[in-house]
Amino acid sequence: MVILSSPSGVGKTTITKKIHQKYPTFKISVSHTTRLPRSNEVNGVDYNFITSNEFEKLINEKKFYEYAKIFDNYYGTLKKNVDDLILNNDLIFDIDWQGTKQLSKFKNLKLIKIYLITSNKKELKERL
C-alpha cells in the first residue's frame, strides 16, 4: 500500500489520480467524510459523504484504520474498504499526516509512505 501524504493544496489528490490512470492496478482508497460535497465531487468516488452521527457511530464501533477531525469535519478510512481492496489490488491512499501516523500503527499493513511538499508558497496560497 502506498500512502501519499501532504498538507492541503500541494497536489496529492491530483498525483493519486494520475497514478491510477497510468497504473489501473492501483486502486484508490476512498475516505469517508462529514463535510459537504463540492460541486464537482461524486459520492463514492471522491469521498463517501456521511453525517457526523454516522461517522461517530463508526468510530465507537472501531471501524476505522484512521480518522481525524479537521476544521470541524471528520475524515477517515474504513477498515473493511481497505481489507476488501487489498486482497487483489495495489492500493494508494491520499491522506494527511495524521492518517499516515495512525495507519503506521497497524503492523499488518505493509506501507510505502511518500510525503509531498512544495517550495512554491505563493502557488500554495492561491490553491487554498
Give the predicted meaning of each segment.
Residues 1-3:
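Extreme N-terminal starter segment of soluble prokaryotic enzymes
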Residues 5-7:
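P-loop (Walker A) phosphate-binding loop of NTP-binding proteins
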Residues 10:
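ATP-binding Walker
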Residues 13:
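Walker A/P-loop
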Residues 16-17:
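The feature captures the helix immediately C-terminal to the Walker
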Residues 21-30:
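Post-Walker A helix-loop "phosphate-sensing" segment adjacent to the P-loop in P-loop NTPases
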Residues 33-91, 97-98:
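ATP-dependent small-molecule kinase phosphotransfer cores
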Residues 91-96, 106-128:
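Conserved phosphate-donor/acceptor-positioning beta-strand/loop module used by diverse small-molecule
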